[in-house]
């Protein structure tokens, strides 16, 4: 398990440290990181060889677009799927990660 928590002052009430987890699943040779509800926490620097990552982008509960970009750059997954983004201008995440080598895939809700 990987910790999942808020670091921004005032938001720790949503996801306090030492309560929630994210997970790395390995199957068919792929390492998939599902972050859970979290922000760009320092523990993400320790993630290695992540093929696919799922990161939450939704205020006020999880990451801003800049936080999600920072988080992704910490461990450089091959593919990134943002989730929980609701009305967030999620296209800005693609722009923020342009040139990083991270393939940002956005699934539009229908």
Predicted regions span which residues?
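A broad detector of the eukaryotic-type serine/threonine protein kinase catalytic domain
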Residues: 55-58, 77
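Binuclear metal-ion centers of metallo-dependent hydrolases, dominated by the metallo-beta-lactamase
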Residues: 67-69, 73-110
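Core dinuclear metal-dependent hydrolase active-site scaffold
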Residues: 1-48, 107-110
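Broad hydrophobic/π-residue packing in well-ordered secondary structure
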Residues: 23-25, 32-34, 61, 85-88, ...
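Divalent metal-coordination and catalytic microenvironments
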Residues: 37, 53, 80
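Redox-cofactor binding/interface segments in oxidoreductases and associated redox assembly factors
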Residues: 4, 55, 82
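Active-site environment of divalent metal-dependent phosphoester hydrolases
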Residues: 7-9, 39-43, 60-65, 82-91
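Active-site metal-binding motif and surrounding structural segment of the metallo-beta-lactamase
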Residues: 48-54
């Amino acid at each position: 398990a990987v910790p999942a928590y808020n670091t921004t002052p005032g938001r720790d009430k949503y996801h306090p440290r030492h309560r929630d987890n994210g997970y790395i699943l390995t199957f068919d040779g792929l390492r998939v990181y599902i972050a859970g509800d979290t922000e760009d926490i320092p523990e993400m620097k320790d993630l290695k060889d992540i093929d696919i990552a799922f990161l939450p982008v939704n205020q006020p509960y999880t990451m801003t677009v800049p936080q999600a970009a920072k988080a992704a750059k910490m461990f450089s997954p091959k593919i990134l799927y943002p989730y929980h983004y609701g009305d967030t201008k999620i296209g800005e995440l693609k722009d923020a990660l342009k040139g990083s080598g991270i393939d940002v895939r956005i699934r539009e809700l229908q």
